[in-house]
Amino acid sequence: MLRSRRSRSRHGAQACAVMSAVLLLASVSLLYTRLSLFSSHSPNHLRSGSSEDTVLFPDSVLVSDSDVETTGGGGRGSTTSTEDRIDEHDDAIEDDGVSNEEDENQDAEQEQEVDLNRNKAASSSGFYFDHVNGVIRRAFNKRSIDEWDYDYTGFSIDSDSSGDKSSRAAFGSDDVPLDESIRRKIVEVTSVEDALLLKSGKKVSPLRQGWGDWFDKKGDFLRRDRMFKSNIETLNPLNNPMLQDPDSVGNTGLTRGDKVVQKWRLNQIKRNPFMAKKPLSVVSEKKEPNEFRLLSSVGEIKRGERKTLDNDEKIEREEQKNVESERKHDEVTEHMYADGTKWGYYPGIEPSLSFSDFMDSFFRKEKCSMRVFMVWNSPGWMFSVRHQRGLESLLSQHRDACVVVFSETVELDFFRNSFVKDSYKVAVAMPNLDELLQDTPTHVFASVWFDWRKTKFYPTHYSELVRLAALYKYGGVYLDSDVIVLGSLSSLRNTIGMEDQVAGESLNGAVMSFEKKSPFLLECLNEYYLTYDDKCLRCNGADLLTRVAKRFLNGKNRRMNQQELNIRPSSVFFPINSQQITNYFAYPAIEDERSQQDESFKKILNESLTFHFWNSVTSSLIPEPESLVAKFLDHSCIRCSDVL
């Protein structure tokens, strides 16, 4: 009985295995049928009962049971199934979950729209401009790594035609894509001022949009801060953020310690100015030979030591002689400046004399056939060949004339290696107004000289006052530096020239010759003091001479005054006026004009004593060879090899 039971149980297990295999095959067959039906079905979509919103789902076999096709005019119940249902309760579950699915679909749709908007915004504004380093960087955010691909859609060359892309492919110096708006602004930059974000008149830099206010406030802060204060505000790197090095920490410039050292060096320079000449000291060279002499009186050992140093002593004596010779050479080569103790220079005259004593010594020592005064208020490098030609023309006509050039801007020995070296009597002196204007109505100008020299037309007004005072105190001839002397001036007495102008005739002080203590010059000095105007250019010069001359000649002592003032026509001193002088700097191209200029050249040489080339009008012009002006400049040259 037990055996029969055991045999049954063995067959029963086999039967169970067979049944399991059959069920497994049935399940696989059913699953295969479902999959085959799913692959042949149309793309899965689900439209809600309200038919207002459509939600897209990814293709998956897990949602294949929810594929429902809605008819055009049917309601919620008018749906047809295209496939068999696994469970007969699917209808009930689906009907009960319609409302839940609608809510879930609406939430999913809103989330998907937010994601799309977020991706779109990220693709258009995923970069920002780093003002510190001057480059474009990627903005930091908390998006998923799967969404990073959206960043580069805007820079794709083969982009779609949707028009949502806000920029195209463009790369800067650091190979970073640039936004289209940035490139559009860069194209509008046309000047350096625009690149530096400066305001030039009404024009505003296009790069100032957005952060121009910050730029102005930052520059204002740097200007107000004492540490970064500067006189050059606009283009100073300490005040202009666009000119600062973005890789540096803070602002570059002098620290407070550097400023202290700079101030100390400036004080040292003020204590020992360049114009002050310090004699070289040779004290150390003189002491050592004396020590060797002392060694000879101390014993045999000392004597032996002295013998071994005899050669060194000879070398040191030679060095001492070289130092003395170099010192003498430096005295010759170094320039001399007016420093309050020296007022003029001429070889053979003590340089430490006062201004009046220097002038008297210069005129007394040299046998002067004529005293000539000139004024030069420009830097020495501006004394060009054409001005040199004026002085040469004077010295060629008057070889023994004593010329004094009054100047505040050139060295006292400015002509030492030129005219003085050639034995011409030319000296440079800085006027001491306190001595020059003494016993004249204009002496008050000496006390206000420091404030007077700050006025706009000081160089011109200073020259006009000095020429009147020098002629009144010493007597002689005054010439402007742009006057060429064509004939002898020895016959001139109390003479001034008329200037021919379009608006009318007036006197011109470029050429004047007066005796010492001239009454006319005294009237001019008094008029200068009474009517001085620091804002008028000609009021204290040509206009002043014209006013005083009319009053002087129409006064009570008419006959006597005519002897004290002789007015010559414009053809004597100014044959060509300032309005026409520029026409004679060019060589005429037509034969008729050349012949006309040749006739004018001969006529001026015969009738005129001077030729004025009006440097205030023609300073920027260069006379062409064989032009009328070039002929007059080279007519009486001494150093003719110097090129104009």
Curated annotation (Swiss-Prot):
One Pfam family recorded for the sequence: Gb3_synth
UniProt cross-references to InterPro entries, sorted A to Z: A1-4-GlycosylTfrase_dom (IPR007652), GlycoTrfase_DXD_sugar-bd_CS (IPR007577), Nucleotide-diphossugar_trans (IPR029044), Put_A1-4-GlycosylTfrase_plant (IPR044789)
PANTHER family the UniProt entry points to: OS07G0567300 PROTEIN (PTHR47213:SF1)
Chain residue ranges for the region called Disordered: 65-117
Top-rank taxon, per record: Eukaryota
Compositionally biased region (Acidic residues): 89-114
Protein name: Uncharacterized protein At4g19900
